[in-house]
């Protein structure tokens, strides 16, 4: 299918929240990782989200360019082309963008989509993330208000983070402390600033102990109940009935999470879960195995000529792609979106 239109993306998220499942959002940095993600979604019979971080986009533009917007646009256009060959929907998103990179990443990408929409086309991306977790929440939400207006005009969903995700991702670091837990006051401020969709659709990355990177279970205390409290506070603020879920939540830093924690988060309105560390490992593991197994072929040892069949990048990148595809399929099963593609109904 072509990349998910704004209407299809909204329908994907609506069904996910209504039926307590979520979509894996897979960080990609290359054509190989994009191919792996899309095939994983298709093998699961699931729709999915592909996203590019600032660092991933810059990497994709190559050492001679090193420009985030160029890389993001190139990856997006590649994804548009490949996704059209598969029978599922893929939404395009950009990951964490802090304040100092807004003018060199998200805002230029919003402008590109605005120009497309003005000519009757769909936006290049379906959603963008603004990460204001490093600044005071009032400033964070003020910037979010401005971005939400521009995003809505371009038929784009905005993702906003309140609280701090611990660990580090692409240079965006968060300390592991009490700020890992979003407060009821933060949820109220978000509703006051951004509303409940009337000013434009947004996703909320509220924090409940999440940490980027790899950690052993038990080192960080995940508290999905914070999401339940956030929905309760927001519903009361909006005079909605008990049990309503005004927020569409995003689960960041989920590597190493227990299945039970994921399932609990889904019940409280998580519709998108970022997956990066686990798919990075899945991609790299067979490459390292290939190198160790074929070391005397990938290297020209003692004057020998090596073995072209094993140092041809395709020989190990195919293995990497297949392994990452399996991990994406696993994520779809964990998040209960397998077999639920909007395209199939």
Curated annotation (Swiss-Prot):
Its cofactor is Zn(2+). D-glyceraldehyde 3-phosphate binds at residue 53. The keyword Lipoprotein does not apply. Pathway: Carbohydrate degradation; glycolysis; D-glyceraldehyde 3-phosphate and glycerone phosphate from D-glucose: step 4/4. Binds 2 Zn(2+) ions per subunit. One is catalytic and the other provides a structural contribution. One of its GO terms (biological process) is glycolytic process. It catalyses: beta-D-fructose 1,6-bisphosphate = D-glyceraldehyde 3-phosphate + dihydroxyacetone phosphate. Its EC number is 4.1.2.13. Dihydroxyacetone phosphate binds at residues 213, 253-255, 274-277. One of its GO terms (molecular function) is fructose-bisphosphate aldolase activity. It is an enzyme of class 4 (lyase). GO terms for cellular component: cytosol. PROSITE patterns: ALDOLASE_CLASS_II_1, ALDOLASE_CLASS_II_2. The active site is at 95 (proton donor). Zn(2+) 1 binds at residues 96, 212, 252. Transmembrane segments: none annotated. Keywords: Glycolysis, Lyase, Metal-binding, Zinc. InterPro entries: Aldolase_TIM, FBA_II, Fruct_bisP_bact. Zn(2+) 2 binds at residues 131, 161. Belongs to the class II fructose-bisphosphate aldolase family. Catalyzes the aldol condensation of dihydroxyacetone phosphate (DHAP or glycerone-phosphate) with glyceraldehyde 3-phosphate (G3P) to form fructose 1,6-bisphosphate (FBP) in gluconeogenesis and the reverse reaction in glycolysis. This is Fructose-bisphosphate aldolase.
């Amino acid at each position: 299918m072509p990349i998910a239109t704004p209407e299809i993306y909204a329908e994907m998220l609506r069904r996910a929240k209504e039926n307590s499942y979520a979509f894996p959002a897979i960080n990609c940095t290359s054509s190989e990782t994009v191919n792996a993600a899309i095939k994983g979604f298709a093998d699961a019979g699931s729709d999915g989200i592909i996203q590019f971080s600032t660092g991933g986009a810059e990497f994709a533009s190559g050492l001679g360019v090193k420009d985030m917007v160029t890389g993001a646009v190139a990856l997006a256009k590649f994804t548009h082309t490949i996704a059209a060959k598969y029978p599922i929907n893929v939404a395009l998103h950009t990951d964490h963008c802090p304040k100092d990179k807004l003018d060199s990443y998200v805002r230029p990408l919003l402008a590109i989509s605005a120009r497309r929409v003005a000519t009757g086309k769909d936006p290049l991306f379906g959603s963008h993330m603004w990460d204001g977790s490093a600044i005071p929440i009032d400033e964070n939400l003020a910037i979010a208000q401005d971005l939400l207006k521009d995003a809505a005009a371009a038929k784009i969903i905005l993702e906003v983070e309140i609280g701090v995700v611990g660990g580090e991702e692409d240079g965006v670091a968060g300390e592991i402390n009490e700020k890992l837990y979003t407060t009821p006051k933060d949820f109220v401020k978000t509703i006051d600033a951004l509303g409940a969709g009337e000013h434009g659709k947004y996703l909320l990355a509220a924090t409940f102990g999440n940490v980027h990177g790899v950690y052993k279970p038990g080192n960080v205390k995940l508290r999905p109940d914070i999401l339940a409290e956030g929905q309760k506070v927001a519903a009361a603020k909006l005079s909605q009935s008990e049990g309503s879920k005004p927020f569409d939540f995003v689960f960041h830093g989920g590597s190493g999470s227990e299945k039970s924690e994921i399932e609990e988060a889904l019940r409280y309105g998580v519709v998108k879960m970022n997956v990066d560390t686990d798919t990075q490992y899945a991609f790299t593991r067979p490459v390292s195995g290939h190198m160790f197994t074929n070391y005397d072929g990938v290297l020209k040892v003692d004057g020998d000529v090596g073995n072209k069949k094993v140092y041809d990048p395709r020989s190990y990148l195919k293995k990497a792609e297949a392994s990452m595809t399996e991990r994406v399929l696993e994520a779809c099963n964990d998040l209960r979106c397998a077999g639920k593609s909007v395209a199939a109904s």
